Swiss-Prot record:
Entry similarity comment: Belongs to the PRA-PH family.
Subcellular location(s) of the protein: Cytoplasm
Protein name (record): Phosphoribosyl-ATP pyrophosphatase
UniProt GO cellular component terms: cytoplasm
Enzyme Commission number(s) of this protein: 3.6.1.31
Main location group: cytoplasm
Biological-process GO terms, alphabetical: L-histidine biosynthetic process
Key words of the record: Amino-acid biosynthesis, ATP-binding, Cytoplasm, Histidine biosynthesis, Hydrolase, Nucleotide-binding
Pathway of action: Amino-acid biosynthesis; L-histidine biosynthesis; L-histidine from 5-phospho-alpha-D-ribose 1-diphosphate: step 2/9
HAMAP family with a match to the protein in the record: HisE
């Protein structure tokens, strides 16, 4: 089965933005603008959550939809995959302070340790 990388998906979204094709779904999203794209990202995010509750096949399908819509969003906003990779790289090796957050531990906001 052929595979497509995230980079190829991004490049496809960028190509459609630069060279619209009448009747394509991607072109439709770009024509409708940011609000429509954001709505679709929100819908697809919810569908990923629901898919994860059901089965892996549905999770894979819905995640693919979400990734597509995220690529369209990134292109629309002028954010490159290199921008995302740089951000991810800046997080490498950083210690998470999540264990220190009272809200994560379930502590009440004004409750002091005994």
């Amino acid at each position: 089965m052929p595979q497509q990388t995230i980079e190829e998906l991004y490049e496809q979204a960028l190509e459609r933005k630069q060279n619209p094709q009448t009747g394509s779904y991607t072109d439709y999203l770009y024509q409708k603008g940011l609000d429509k794209i954001l709505k679709k990202v929100g819908e697809e995010s919810t569908e990923v959550i629901l898919g994860a509750k059901n089965n892996n096949e549905e999770l894979i399908y819905e995640t693919s939809d979400l990734l597509f819509h995220l690529m369209v969003l990134l292109v629309e906003k002028g954010v490159s995959l290199d921008d995302i990779k740089d951000e991810l790289g800046s997080r490498l090796g950083k210690k998470s302070l999540l264990h220190e957050r009272a809200d994560w531990r379930g502590d009440k906001k004004n409750e002091k340790d005994s």
